[in-house]
């Protein structure tokens, strides 16, 4: 039993060392900064396109505002009045644009999804690109089905709330608990779909589940931590005043992308077990605290019996 525990511990240590080196190699923080910048430029166009898709269906009249309020309340922690007001103002201003401007909005939103596609495929070391028609179909599916699924879940929630069965105290308590888990379920589903569908290679479901669960937990913890920071240390609003919405939103988007990419790194590294399993690696690499996996090759060569190595 003790030997199995030690072996599991060494396996875990080997994996975390490999994951650390992988994250450093992929320059995760730099990629997250790039994605945050692209997202900040494409956020309003993307939301506008999503809301315009909903507005094309009479049954979804008024759904845009419902989805917008739900996203701001549950996925932007402690959104100050400045952030919420600025987002709504930016989105409302797009209604004054011409057809040409609307076309540019669509292009900007596709550019964001394309950037996500490139970043995740780089993490999975995918060099083969998808066919243009397949990529366009995938992007179009995200732009159309995404808001419809969110609205459908919110509509189902509203319908259940209106039922007489909700008058029962036990059922009502259970429903409120379930409703509280809805944002977590949606974020986990989004991470899972992202890690399964975007990479242009076959991903094992259990690896994607671990990555999505890790990213989901980090996301929920980050929401609480970021909300506490914004409310307890409102330095951005003191320094920037009315412009505080921009840096606050950028920092949160940057943090979100770090979480997304960490989840992707976890999912991808689980599929590369041949590089971190203890049986495949020189075990004395774990004796030193600051030793990294790449040093094991040098240690092996120095101990070689090959005359050329001496």
From Swiss-Prot:
Transmembrane spans: 34-54, 97-117, 136-156, 178-198, 207-227, 242-262
Main location: membrane
Assigned keywords, A-Z: Cell inner membrane, Cell membrane, Membrane, Transmembrane, Transmembrane helix
InterPro entries: UPF0761_bac, Virul_fac_BrkB
Places the protein is found: Cell inner membrane
GO cellular component, as recorded: plasma membrane
Membrane topology type: Multi-pass membrane protein
A Pfam family of this chain: Virul_fac_BrkB
Keyword Ribosomal protein: no
HAMAP family with a match to the protein in the record: UPF0761
Family: Belongs to the UPF0761 family.
Name the record gives this protein: UPF0761 membrane protein VSAL_I2938
Organism per entry: Aliivibrio salmonicida (strain LFI1238) (Vibrio salmonicida (strain LFI1238))
């Amino acid at each position: 039993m003790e030997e199995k525990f030690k072996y599991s511990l060494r396996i875990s240590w080997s994996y975390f060392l490999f994951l650390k080196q992988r994250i450093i190699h992929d320059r995760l923080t730099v990629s997250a900064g790039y994605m945050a910048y692209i997202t900040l430029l494409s956020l309003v166009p993307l939301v506008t396109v999503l809301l315009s898709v909903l507005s094309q269906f009479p049954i979804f009249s008024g759904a845009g505002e419902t989805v917008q309020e739900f996203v701001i309340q549950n996925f932007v922690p402690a959104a100050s009045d400045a952030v919420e007001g600025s987002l709504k103002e930016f989105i409302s201003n797009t209604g004054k644009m011409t057809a040409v401007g609307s076309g540019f909005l669509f292009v900007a939103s596709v550019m964001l999804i394309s950037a996500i596609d490139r970043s995740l495929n780089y993490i999975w070391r995918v060099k083969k690109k998808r066919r243009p028609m397949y990529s366009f179909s995938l992007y179009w599916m995200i732009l159309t089905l995404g808001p419809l699924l969110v609205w459908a879940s919110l509509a189902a929630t509203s319908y259940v709330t209106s039922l007489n069965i909700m008058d029962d105290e036990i059922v009502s308590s259970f429903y409120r608990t379930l409703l509280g888990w809805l944002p977590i379920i949606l974020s986990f589903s989004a991470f899972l779909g992202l890690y399964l569908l975007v990479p242009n290679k076959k991903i094992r479901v259990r690896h994607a589940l671990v990555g999505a669960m890790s990213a989901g937990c980090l996301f929920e913890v980050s929401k609480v931590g970021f909300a506490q920071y914004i409310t307890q240390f409102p330095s951005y609003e003191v320094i920037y005043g009315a412009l505080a919405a921009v840096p606050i939103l950028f920092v949160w988007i940057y943090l979100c992308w770090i979480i997304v990419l960490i989840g992707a790194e976890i999912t991808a590294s689980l599929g590369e077990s041949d590089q971190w399993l203890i049986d495949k690696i020189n075990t004395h690499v774990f004796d030193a605290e600051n030793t990294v996996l790449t040093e094991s090759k040098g240690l092996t060569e120095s101990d070689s019996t090959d005359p050329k190595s001496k």
